[in-house]
A protein has these predicted regions:
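Acidic-basic catalytic patches of nuclease active cores, encompassing PD-(D/E)XK
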Residues: 1-49
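Short glycine/proline-enriched coil/turn segments at helix->beta-strand junctions
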Residues: 32-33, 62-65, 92-97
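Active-site-adjacent loop/helix micro-motif of nuclease/hydrolase catalytic cores
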Residues: 73-85
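Nucleic-acid nuclease catalytic cores
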Residues: 89-118
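A structural signal for short, well-ordered beta-strand segments and their strand-loop junctions
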Residues: 39, 66-68, 99-103
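Charged, often glycine-rich, active-site loop that binds/positions anionic groups
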Residues: 45-59
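Conserved catalytic cores of phosphodiester-cleaving nucleases, focusing on short active-site segments
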Residues: 58-74
Length: 149
């Protein structure tokens, strides 16, 4: 039997194929307020050419806040890219409050909270790299749920 590579170990062109679809679908069913799609969803653009703040526009807009959706699974690691973290904090400070919606597909649980509440874990997180070299904070799902759940 052929074991597919873990998500973080797959090349970017494979990761992007379904990136966020499951978690975003769960958010849309879970969210109890009106929302509209706001951020870029795999556009046919050279994303690397776009400014980071545009590239990392939060996924959804509500009347009171923006929402960034992120999923994770079996490894129980929330992988927050360093540049995405900085961009989301900019949106939170300068445009509108940002909430992070996390979907744990392995344990079928969800959590939404103001993005800045993640800072204590970010400040102590291990930095790892995706195969193409992009760095991310590796956050233990258990620690996130203990702190914010």
């Amino acid at each position: 039997m052929n074991n597919p590579a873990q998500f973080a170990d797959q090349p970017f062109n494979k990761r992007i194929e379904g990136m966020g679809d499951l978690a975003e679908g769960v958010f849309e069913g879970w969210c109890g307020v009106n929302y509209v799609r706001y951020g870029l969803n795999r556009p046919p653009l050279a994303m690397w050419k776009l400014p980071l703040r545009i590239r990392h526009t939060p996924d959804y807009l509500t009347s009171d806040y923006l929402v960034e959706v992120q999923g994770f699974g079996r490894k129980q690691i929330v992988q927050m890219k360093l540049d995405k973290w900085k961009s989301l904090l900019w949106w939170d400070r300068n445009v509108m409050p940002v909430r992070l919606f996390l979907h744990d597909s392995h344990n079928d649980r969800q959590l939404m909270f103001p993005i800045k509440k993640l800072r204590p874990l970010i400040d102590n997180a291990e930095v790892r790299k995706f195969p193409e070299g992009n760095e991310y904070y590796a956050l233990s799902a258990g620690e996130v749920w203990s702190l914010l759940g």
